[in-house]
A protein has these predicted regions:
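A structural signal for short, well-ordered beta-strand segments
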Residues: 111-112, 171-173
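Short, solvent-exposed loop/turn segments at secondary-structure junctions
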Residues: 29-31, 114-119, 162, 177-180, ...
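Active-site region of the double-stranded beta-helix
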Residues: 141-146, 158-163, 173-184, 190-192
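Double-stranded beta-helix
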Residues: 3-6, 178-241
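A short beta-loop-beta micro-motif enriched in histidine and acidic residues
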Residues: 94, 103, 157-168, 225-226, ...
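Non-heme Fe(II)-dependent double-stranded beta-helix
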Residues: 1-19, 26-157
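Extracellular structured ligand-interaction cores
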Residues: 22, 152-154, 166-172, 182, ...
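Active-site rim elements
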Residues: 81-87, 157-160, 216-229
């Protein structure tokens, strides 16, 4: 991850994952293969206004509020036979990092493409519909054929979890160059120590330090967290819990 004088100085090496709740694995994947796969995804699952229902009326007539996101075993672009992820899953450095993190018997619980949708691509009626939603999942408003990837727009701080005792790690792979202002992942270091809390989370930004947040679990426990912005090139990997 490129160094930035404005970011907190945090050692994001894998050995510090238990304390930080996140780690930078680095640009360990083949850059050309990562970029080529990004082009393949962009061709098959583009980001533009043509993937969305054209009006609220069309959505209410044809859309749904369930089963609209990529599944573990079906309706998932990455499960298509023409998709080859061996450049990731069989990469020796990736395998070693996952074994160090999760043990030799680790399994990939779920994999999915996440696409960040810029404002210009979101139809006005949808933008108005979700403007007060902190985690605007756009998939309900996307035609069925495109719902096998995940589309988000301006996502708020949240936790990846399925249950209170969740024991998985989320692994992010960048397929192209991601700068700080290009929908980069933002993480509150150490916030995992508070455990699972409900959304929207009790967060307040410091008035003195733009990259520091005050976090509460709403039961009397409080902590301060540094925010990091995860930038990197094609083939870069970052993980968090």
């Amino acid at each position: 991850m490129p160094k930035d004088a404005n970011l907190p100085k945090v050692d994001l090496s894998l050995q510090n994952f238990p304390d930080n709740g996140c780690a930078e694995i680095g640009a360990i994947l083949d850059k050309e293969k990562s970029s080529a796969f990004r082009s393949f995804v962009n061709e098959k699952r583009p980001v533009n206004d043509s993937i969305f229902y054209k009006s609220k009326e069309e959505f209410e007539a044809k859309g749904r509020w369930e089963n609209y996101s990529p599944g573990r075993e079906s309706h998932n672009f990455l499960l298509k036979p023409e998709v080859d992820l061996s450049f990731v899953e069989e990469n020796p450095a990736f395998v070693q990092a996952m074994e160090n993190l999760c043990g030799k018997g680790y399994q990939i619980f779920k994999k999915a493409i996440i696409r960040s949708v810029p404002s210009w691509a979101v139809p006005e009626w949808i933008d108005d519909y979700v403007k007060d939603v902190g985690r605007p999942n756009l998939n309900p408003f996307v035609y069925d054929e495109f719902q096998d990837v995940q589309y988000f727009h301006c996502t708020d701080f949240h936790q990846d979890k399925t249950r209170r005792e969740s024991d998985f790690v989320t692994v992010y792979l960048y397929l192209d160059q991601v700068e700080a202002d290009y929908s980069a992942l933002r993480v509150l270091v150490g916030s995992h120590k508070m455990g699972m809390t409900t959304y929207p989370h009790a967060l307040r930004r410091s008035m003195h330090d733009h990259d520091r947040w005050f976090y509460s679990d709403s039961t009397g426990n409080n902590m301060q967290c540094d925010q990091i912005t995860v930038t990197g090139g094609a083939g870069s990997i970052f993980c968090f819990h």
